[in-house]
Amino acid sequence: MKKILVIPLLFLANLLIAQQVEGSWKLTHQNGKKVDNKEVVKIYQDGYFSFGAKEADSDKFISAGGGEFSLRDNYYVESYDFHTEKEELIGTQVEFSLDVVDGKLVISTEKGGSAHVEIWENISDSKDELTRNWVITGRKTDDKISRSTPGARRTIKILSGGRFQWVAFNSETKQFSGTGGGTYSAEDGKYVEKIEFFSRDDSRVGASLSFDFEVIDGEWHHSGMSSTGNPIYEIWTKYSDGYKKPAN
């Protein structure tokens, strides 16, 4: 009986740890030094993560990265789908130790024979109707919906802890097409986002965009005017449903 109970209890414990990191986090310390020259925000949701970084004293975009993650006890693994600074990481896994100390994430590993330690402070773990990792699977033009199946080339949008980040990339060719992120709210059918970083055009930082949203059969229908002033109607599907990994 004890052996039978061990496996489900371990699974439950690991699931609770994974849920504990869901939300948005800000990098505060790196190798014992306070991070004040850049702003790095990381979002965890549904077994996926993404981060975006910009200069602290300007709106200049620095970098972005993300992919799937797994947690077992304090054994933490990141599997990269995109990384703007280190393309060689795409398609690889990096192992870390992760501890939760006083509500902060302490992530550590060894690099070049020396310890590398990051401390992340929780921004928020709030959830709403759109809290999820999404992948775009459809668009509506002239009352006609066209569908697509995400492959190596895909666009994701991760929302959790009051933060959002979209990323367009190709995990096979390692091509990065763009990203943007910031804060958002989703209430009474209105989705509002405020841009805090944008890789394609720093001048759009600070802009606030309002859209209509509706969740239909588990999919996010997103409509309104884009940041360029063009009408859009997008359909976003839960990432784990919309994107299927190719068989090895």
What are these regions (language model features)?
Residues 18-64, 70-179, 187, 192-248:
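Lipid interaction determinants
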Residues 1-22:
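Bacterial Sec-dependent N-terminal signal peptides
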